[in-house]
Amino acid sequence: MDHNVSGLNFGEDISGATGSIILNGTDGSSTDAGDNIVFDRTDSGGTDENGNVTLEDGTSGYSVISAPTKTELAGGTDDYALTAGEYESAYDKFEDTESLDINLVLGGRGGGAGDTSSSQDTHVTMLTALVEKRRDCVAFVSPYRSATVGVALSNTATSNVVAAFNLCPSSSYVVFDSAYKYMFDKYNDVFRFVPLNGDTAGLCAFTDQIADSFFSPAGFNRGNVRGAVKLSYNPTKAERDRLYRARINPVVNFPGQGVVLFGDKTALSKPSAFDRINVRRLFLLLEKAIATAAKFQLFEFNDEFTRAQFRNLVEPFLRDIQGRRGITDFSVKADATNNTGEVIDRNEFVADIFIKPARSINFITLNFIAVRTGVSFTEVGG
């Protein structure tokens, strides 16, 4: 390996005796005796024994290693861009409730295969069909990206989000949020906007961990969104009210308090107990647990003994949920009044379970009243 006079570059001339590696350090010639550094493992001509590094004259050249080559793949299809049909085919894989136990479904990109209100409607309709068919999980959806990302005016972003979600179907098994968060992607070493549906689902999982699934995941106690540098848009109070009326849970950056999920509505459009996340998830918990208990009544006799056995399975469980503040009251009915002769002859078993769910506080009213010095509080306070 040659080194030129200036000491900057290596040449390609490599030569030397068999078993030796010679580094020529002067003029590029491998024939000058005494000017080569030789790593000699055969001691074929040096003056020192035992394989030491010696200075000697090489006699035969080594072959030059060829330059590296590269091979490029050709053909194939770049399938990074997904179509709506491919999304639907993927969601169809999760329809089987017996083989797949699912609790939370993350919608990912709000627009699905596109980035418009129309593509969002298509995507949300697919998710709604999935969770309505399963009826044992909740889907979480964010608006399409360009509805809020890069939009200068907060009022315009609110209008975009409301208009997009107005197209989406009503369901108590779906939850809408309002924006994207700006976060650091440590795997690609960049900052990027990410839809908040993953955070909303994560808050539900966090609530399961520190409390119970029938507690609301929103608010300052359990609704703090982690890892958010900023939001794609931060709705004002008036805009939050507008979003909430449209079934959309606003995510808000409160100065000094962080980014907070500030709503716990489901996507159900009509007034109902199931228009709140905690009530829907409470019933998912109850339905899964009690349905598992009910399986053990299959192929038994539909008599008073079996009915009493079922009640004794369910009532302690509901009392436990009541003690953990999930429900205020309940009643289990499985007797001859709802298991009539016709029901028994059809080889069926009927149980009616009445639940009074606990409700979360969405609005607080504080009344401050100034009274005269001589007035008794019992007179003005009732």
Where are these regions (language model features)?
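Structured, hydrophobic secondary-structure cores that serve as assembly/anchoring elements
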Residues: 3-382
